Amino acid sequence: GLVRLALGRGRFFEAPFVEFDAYVDRVIQQSGVFYRLIFVHRYTQKSFHKTAFSTIESSKSEVLALWDVLQTYMDVTQPLPDVPRLEPFRHLDPVTAEHDLRSGRNPRFWRDLDLEAWKQGEGKEWLKRQMEYPWDKRQCRLTPQLGKISMAEYRKLRPADAWPI
């Protein structure tokens, strides 16, 4: 699918999702080291670090999990990621609707969830699995370098006339 990112002043940059490489950027602040996802268009070297998906996170695994969710979301052969934000739309996607029917997924799972109980039980387990997941061993289908090169190293490799990061 296509990605459309705002450049400001009513201008947009649009390109196929597969043309974007994702990088984890370390953000050093007074309160500690944080992480965010940066998108770089492979052919123009334009970088985007102020998107809805570039929030600063305290955990690198949270950023890597977000990239995994985005790849799943953009892959039309897979069901939509099972996240609260997408639940109201799952029935509109044929692949997801079929998957949910086969798996017996409650169409209101997230909306009817007792959040506090979930945080103490299953949610706590999900977070633990995400934190312990061997992200560095996983081969990213779209961006094989994710997590293998730092943003500082990437900046050094960029052409001098590339879009500034």
PLM-predicted stretches and their roles:
Residues 13-18, 52-54, 114:
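Short, solvent-exposed coil/turn linker segments
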